[in-house]
């Protein structure tokens, strides 16, 4: 049975996120000035999506309106002030002389007016574990309970190149690590780590916007590359050191750059795009980085605010087949413009879902569950053009190519692959249902297919029975399957060009809306929860048998069809129908 999907319970507004908003000042926040900052800034035009894959949407004037404010101050919450004060007390109590710096994403997010609970402290003269031990000594000296210290060892597969110590301070997890510099061997992505200066540490970061420090000792933001704040102003994704050298040192940084550009709707710098498109860099990304790390980055993109922008950037930089590697032999083989079709489908699904809006994707479910379903919907849309491609695995079993990419290329959960395959299969069944509901086709053939010698379905109930059986199989995620179906069918050779047309998307939106309304009018939404009017035990009583078996299973299916054809029918009426059907059949058999 396929996993339950509830994409129709996404937050109001559909799949697309709302515009970024500046957070209102709070009386609990204390303003910390930047070391050098001329005021609030607005970002230059950035890429958005509503038309062609990989093309900027809207006029320059429209793009100018989509700007993100960068704060001129860092605002500390009351809890953050308490945490930082406690850390400074430790330094002063033991005379450590340590400069405490909050590193990376926390500083970036604060300047962008976003809350962040990800506090990483960089230490300039000691290891993280040693500092945590000093914290515990201090806690003991003031009569407080010591805290446990977790040490995260180096683990390159999880991008952990240096030992990190973690402990709970005022109910908040804090990571501690020493400042570092690093160099890479020619044949390895694992760096040689050395204790470094703050400036060396800043330059070894992946991006300038992630290289900023907040110095707790003197309450200031440090921009030691000289570019971090300026690049935030411009909305630019830039590497502190030359991009090609940075990517060859750690090719995963290509995907990190794309992910952060998508998250903040920033622009990739031209030299960065050129380096990311370099054949050697692409080769290193495919051969030097584990598939698990690649899959983790892609999954973060798909779960973030602007997944379509990320996928489009991957395609535009020539990285699609590096990231989404295909099996060696598939049937049919990879077709022309396969990558473009995949990108077109995820963008069309995103735009279609947003245009349909809250009547389809309404609130009422656990937000984490909603996010998970949105993620699976996007994977399904991305791989829709591959739904009829298969390969033979080691056991000569026929496996969908989309399943291979999810499980082998991205190393995601097997259940993710199963869900995507199930959505594609459901979409195909929905195509048949759409044809039935949308046209005046003769239902005679379908009527005969649903009936047998014991069951006769009224002509005006055929559509309801057929649709009900499909929905009972698809269950909660029928709207997802319908969304994928109206994008995938009818098939078009030039899908890349077709799906970018607003009038075409409008037609498919109208089709979705009509079918969704028809299913609702037939009172089938939730039909999979319908309790059978007759259970197996009741059927056995009518049949006058003492044990179940295939015969009872067949009658359960007939009773379900009868129930769908007679939504107001009672148990007694269903039993009477069964008795009459058996009696009629017995008379026919006797006469013959």
Which residues are covered by each model-predicted region?
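Catalytic cores of the polymerase beta-like nucleotidyltransferase superfamily
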Residues: 1-592
């Amino acid at each position: 049975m396929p996993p339950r999907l509830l994409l129709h319970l996404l937050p109001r507004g559909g799949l697309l996120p709302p515009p970024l908003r500046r957070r209102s000042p709070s009386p609990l926040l204390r303003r910390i000035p930047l070391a050098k900052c001329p005021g609030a800034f607005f970002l230059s035009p950035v890429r958005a999506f509503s038309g062609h894959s990989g093309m900027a949407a809207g006029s320059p004037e429209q793009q100018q309106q989509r700007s993100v404010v960068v704060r001129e101050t860092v605002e500390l919450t009351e809890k953050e002030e308490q945490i930082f004060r406690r850390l400074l007390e430790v330094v002063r109590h033991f005379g450590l002389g340590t400069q405490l710096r909050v590193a990376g994403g926390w500083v970036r997010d604060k300047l962008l007016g976003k809350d962040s609970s990800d506090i990483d402290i960089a230490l300039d003269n000691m290891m993280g574990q040693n500092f945590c031990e000093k914290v515990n000594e201090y806690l003991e000296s003031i009569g407080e309970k010591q805290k446990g210290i977790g040490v995260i060892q180096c683990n390159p597969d999880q991008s952990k190149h240096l030992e990190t110590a973690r402990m709970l301070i005022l109910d908040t997890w804090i990571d501690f690590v020493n400042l570092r510099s690093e160099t890479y061997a020619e044949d390895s992505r694992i760096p040689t780590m050395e204790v470094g200066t703050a400036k060396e540490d800043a330059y070894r970061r992946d991006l300038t916007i992630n290289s900023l420090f907040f110095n707790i000792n003197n309450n200031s933001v440090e921009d030691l590359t000289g570019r971090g704040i300026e690049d935030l102003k411009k909305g630019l994704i830039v590497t502190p050191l030359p991009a090609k050298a940075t990517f060859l040192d750690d090719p995963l940084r290509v995907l990190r750059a794309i992910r952060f550009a998508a998250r903040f709707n920033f622009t990739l710098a031209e030299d960065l795009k050129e380096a990311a498109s370099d054949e050697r860099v692409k080769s290193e990304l495919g051969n030097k980085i584990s598939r698990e790390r690649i899959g983790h980055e892609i999954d973060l993109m798909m779960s973030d605010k602007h997944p379509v922008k990320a996928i489009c950037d991957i395609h535009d930089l020539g990285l699609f087949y590096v990231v989404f590697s295909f099996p060696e032999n598939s049937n049919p083989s990879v077709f022309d413009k396969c990558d473009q079709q995949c990108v077109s489908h995820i963008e069309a699904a995103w735009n279609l879902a947003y245009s349909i809006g809250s009547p389809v994707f309404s609130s009422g479910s656990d937000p984490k569950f909603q996010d998970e379903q949105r993620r699976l919907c996007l994977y399904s849309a991305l791989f829709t053009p591959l739904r009829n491609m298969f390969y033979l695995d080691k056991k000569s079993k026929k496996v969908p190519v989309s399943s291979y990419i999810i499980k082998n290329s991205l190393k995601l959960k097997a259940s993710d692959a199963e869900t995507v395959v199930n959505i594609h299969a459901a979409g195909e069944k929905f195509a048949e249902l759409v044809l039935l509901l949308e046209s005046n086709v003769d239902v005679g053939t379908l009527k005969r297919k649903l009936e047998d010698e014991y069951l006769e379905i009224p002509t005006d109930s055929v559509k309801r029975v057929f649709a009900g059986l499909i929905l009972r199989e698809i269950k909660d995620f029928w709207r997802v399957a319908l969304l994928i179906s109206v994008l995938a069918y009818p098939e078009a050779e030039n899908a890349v060009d077709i799906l970018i047309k607003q009038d075409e998307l409008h037609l498919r939106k109208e089709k979705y809306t009509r079918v969704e309304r028809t299913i609702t009018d037939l009172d089938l939404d939730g039909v999979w929860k319908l309790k059978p009017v007759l259970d197996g035990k009741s059927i056995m009583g009518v049949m006058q048998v003492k044990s179940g078996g295939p015969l009872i299973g067949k009658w359960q299916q007939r009773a379900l069809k009868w129930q769908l054809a007679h939504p107001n029918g009672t148990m007694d009426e269903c039993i009477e129908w069964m008795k009459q059907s058996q009696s009629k059949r017995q008379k026919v058999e006797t006469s013959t």
